Amino acid sequence: INKLGIGIADNLLLECALAYDGKVLIAPAMNTNMLKKSITERNLKLLSISDYKIIKTQSKLLACNSFGDGAMAEPIEIFYAVSKELLKEEFWENRRVVVSGGGTIERIDDVRFISNFSSGKMANPIALALYLKGADVCFITTKKLNLRDELYTIEIENSKEMKNFLEDALRVAKKGVLIKPNL
């Protein structure tokens, strides 16, 4: 990472990374002390400014048998980061989108309720697909099924909550495309 950050290409991997003109994703894995060194932090920031995508490390038991930050991201996290880069479309980038799904429950008393058969199973992949396309997704649901933490999810129960959160989310979404600040 440090060699790449200062442009040293003394092996095939670094030569390819420096010569490639597309998006490069980096999933760091190192000891906490290495990760927290100012030179490593500086080079990671420099690489991210230079249009390299840095996938966040995890805090857990490391190879050196100490607990701390520096473990490589889980394969599923790397998969989603790569998928998001490959699937993103300019039209959807930073565009606010509201997706709702799942059946609401109207309580009659402490034991009984009225509901419907809506599972929310279709809304989940729609929200995920829009996220992977680059949209800023607000997902309002009664049933969150294994979605990304990056998806802003509001869990609700009844139709009144659904209506209120939908109105608020739509009001915010109408403001248009998000402008993400540069470093």
Region annotations inferred by a language model:
Residues 27-29, 98-102, 141, 179-182:
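Short beta-strand segments
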Residues 41-57, 148-171:
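Short, electropositive alpha-helical surface patch
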